Amino acid sequence: MASAEPRPRMGLVINAKPDYYPIELSNAELLSHFEMLQEYHQEISTNVIAQSCKFKPNPKLIDQQPEMNPVETRSNIITFLFELSVVTRVTNGIFFHSVRLYDRYCSKRIVLRDQAKLVVATCLWLAAKTWGGCNHIINNVVIPTGGRFYGPNPRARIPRLSELVHYCGDGQVFDESMFLQMERHILDTLNWNIYEPMINDYVLNVDENCLMQYELYENQVTYDKQCSEKRQSQLSQDSDATVDERPYQNEEEEEEDLKLKIKLINLKKFLIDVSAWQYDLLRYELFEVSHGIFSIINQFTNQDHGPFLMTPMTSESKNGEILSTLMNGIVSIPNSLMEVYKTVNGVLPFINQVKEYHLDLQRKLQIASNLNISRKLTISTPSCSFENSNSTSIPSPASSSQSHTPMRNMSSLSDNSVFSRNMEQSSPITPSMYQFGQQQSNSICGSTVSVNSLVNTNNKQRIYEQITGPNSNNATNDYIDLLNLNESNKENQNPATAHYLNGGPPKTSFINHGMFPSPTGTINSGKSSSASSLISFGMGNTQVI
């Protein structure tokens, strides 16, 4: 049996191939657009910044998510969203804007873990329908062009619901009706305010949106250069005339500038995608993040770039924090992002350069930390040894023996004061009272010894000085009488003051003679402390017999 003839295709059949968008036309459109922007430059910049600040996510509220803790879950959910944006072939900037919608939604609603993919996929769908892009430089509205031209921008690509259902669980978890319900829920939560400025408005200039046009122009320049070289080689073989090299130099300079421009556009797009993973950047405004992106580009490319919009200047501290966050994000770049950008012109050398710089910086910080630790150990080592406790030391200077009350003698040198430093107590802040359990034999009714019954130590000190002084003849008899009196009243003597009569004045050691000496009114007065002064001296005097 003869094979059946193929049935003709029904419907409109288009065999036309898209043409390249004319470069002359795109240049004229860009020039006209720049002239218009110059007239309303300040008003446009003010409005863009105001809208960005108005719709800024709140990281403090995102931190309160019970199941979607950003520290634990953000990396995984953003990686899934990026992979979804790659397989659905959405245009540049849609991924970052969908992350922005997700953060704004998390600032107002609780997101369950099993519904996280549904939320981020719906945010991607909304962002693609809002900022899907088209194949025109100036227009921002999604308008189908019919595929007549190739370039200068990628065509609009809005994911189908069937694609989202397939990539979010192959129809076993979510269906199309759930995406429609979630879309309406997100719109109601955000009050239908999903049309906000993008970070591309700050980082990418108008002419940098037409990367396809630059790549097309680069291919054309390369092809013209090859044809010109062949033509010049044929002319040089046919004739001995010298060939003018000035056209070659101009073409090489133009080609080099074109390559640098393409690398710059690729780096900007790469850093925009890297910033989407960094949760710490939510604390800053979009224009501050854009300044950080330009700072890291200028640092590693030795160029001077800035935003086209008029934006406020960022403080050095904020700019340094953003720069450090971006560098950490590049060092720990996700594998899915690396797979996409490893073949893009100029991105992989930039990543390696940042990693080398970060590694070198970590080494320097480690060396500085080790030096600081060694210095601390050297300083904490005592520079001189303390004096032995048995060494002779300077006695305490004499002070007034008068006290305001008999029970509380505030004189710092009085041994019969309740705050005496010669008695051991539990704490220098809370002094302990003297306890006398001895009975005085000649006291009335056998009462215990009172504080007033004790002989004042300062009076003993003056008697001692009189004995050893020039007029010691008259004072010797008084001193002998005092010895006899104390011998008869030995049971009522304070052991802390007995050494005045037996061995001379007390020996007090003053070790801390530095800038911060220890207080003399506490029990810790005679103890050395290396924390109070780094330099301590042990001083003594000759004991008088």
Curated annotation (Swiss-Prot):
Feature: compositional bias, Polar residues: 404-414
InterPro entries: Cyclin-like_dom, Cyclin-like_sf, Cyclin_CLN, Cyclin_N, Cyclins_cyclin-box
One cellular component (GO) term of this entry: cytoplasm
One biological process term in Gene Ontology: re-entry into mitotic cell cycle after pheromone arrest
Gene Ontology terms, MF aspect: cyclin-dependent protein serine/threonine kinase regulator activity
PANTHER family reported for this sequence: CYCLIN N-TERMINAL DOMAIN-CONTAINING PROTEIN 1 (PTHR21615:SF2)
Family: Belongs to the cyclin family.
Protein name stated in the entry: G1/S-specific cyclin CLN2
Organism taxonomic ancestry: Eukaryota, Fungi, Dikarya, Ascomycota, Saccharomycotina
